[in-house]
């Protein structure tokens, strides 16, 4: 039963007088829903949420689904991920007893046991209760003591804790004492940054970089900091010294210090647009000013400096120093030599037709390169000349001894492998996280040793429990053919008979309830990962889960992403539609039993599947979406995404943007599958008005629309496990009822 069948007329269908604006653009009759916390808008939201409570949430299955998911999220058996700070290992943890979460620490010896002894550092539930705030943890940064302080036995003391009210991107930063386990009040000289988008970063124990909202004119059009300052303890914020000021057109300005002993350096980062950045070396001159030296690489490149090395990851081809380097390559040069004018590079990675760079992680002596090969991870250890023993050279020699390649033994052939350095300043230890759709996540500890080939076998430290019975289930990877002939990979997960389909010897019925998920933007790759919630609420109930690796993502490097930018956005949607058709052609499901879901940029994908390909789906979930592409640059952080979608205020660009703006593509005369819109009032990244307005427009035309908006949660949708379980249950029950 749909919402419009169970409720009387309400603001859900109310539009306002339609008159054109002075600039000629059509009036938006649902503009009032952009008032995030306006009385009328919130009344509309509450009415929609009440409809969900009266329909989806009343079924017995809803409570069971919510409970099953909550058990996964609250499980004490989950892997507690840790970060090494000094000789302790810190973890932030949520469970049934710690709804907001607890920041805690232990030793490595204790962490290796089945039941570690945790020392509470900060109880967020107690803090929220004491201060009357719905605090959501945004993380902490800790100042590394100097070598002299460490030699004298001084502890790691100075932390900067970031907390968000309700889960918004805007947060506060407060200084915290790790020894005394308390906040350092501003009246006691503690650093405190008021709520805004921005941050603080340690320079030394009495100085920080601050980039935040300093008042009128100090934010970019995207709502991010435009000014970075150096702030001294005990002085007012307005006395902080400006280090760098961006332009009115920039996206984000920030600064930080690298505290690696012997390689202490300061940097200023200028983000001009989403894929256009500048990095400056900031050197003290003995005056309040700092001398800035631009790192002379393409603005489209990703740049990193570690100890004596400069790493450059290319998004575009680059000709320099008499050589041309391909987009997607990873280059290395000695940083000081580069600053002196040397443009010789060593190629550490060069992409192929099936491979792309997923990441590069430094340890004390090595660089671990993570490569995706047809969306499967492969790891390589590269050792720079100063630490290398004789062995096979990597890439091209650049007036220097070669880097040396070695391999990590004992890794799975399939699935996802994520890499994290335990302590990149002092050790060559690695955390390895391995996972796939049906295998619970495992955390291993690996010591690479100082020299190539010294690595031992990974030591399994923690494993998640099996939250669902995967016996009889399987994972398959297939390729669909898009409209222009491009092969698009996708993974299918579920019972073996259902995954096999009804054709070519398969024993399936061809009508399996199937959820197809995608994203397709911002260079983000979708790789296999275990989800206890998905397994319990969908796979164990006979559902099939599919992940489409469409263009716009990062699965095959920069070219794969750039193929779906701006005027070519339609390629991402054609890819997704091709996967949907391939699932039907393989006899796995039918359009009536095929649902799809996308969030954020994936919500834009979902909106386009809904409005451009409604015949392919039996249900659509549109989560925290962009939908009104005429106004997206004017809403919250939207201006920062013009490099991805284009500028709707440019008439020529609007001509192609309008072809993927679901709010404008909706046609009251067309038939659409049932749709669920979800968002959060506290989302200050993607405006909740996107979801509100299209839902209202469709409800006004009598379409089958379900709408749920969490009052907290930010762009992630939920502020705690209870909210996350509830939101997920809404999703799965909607799909179960619509897809059969």
Region roles according to the model:
Residues 1-429, 435-439, 445-446, 454-455, ...:
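Beta-propeller folds
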Residues 201, 209, 266-267, 280-281, ...:
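Structured core elements
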Residues 126-147, 155, 163-168, 182, ...:
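Cap/lid segment of the alpha/beta-hydrolase catalytic domain
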Residues 534, 547-740:
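Active-site-proximal cap/loop segments of hydrolase catalytic domains
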Residues 353-376, 432, 436, 480-488, ...:
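C-terminal substrate/ligand-recognition segments
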Residues 96, 166, 193, 201, ...:
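Active-site-proximal structural scaffolding
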Residues 120, 242, 544, 704-706:
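Conserved beta-strand segments of alpha/beta enzyme cores
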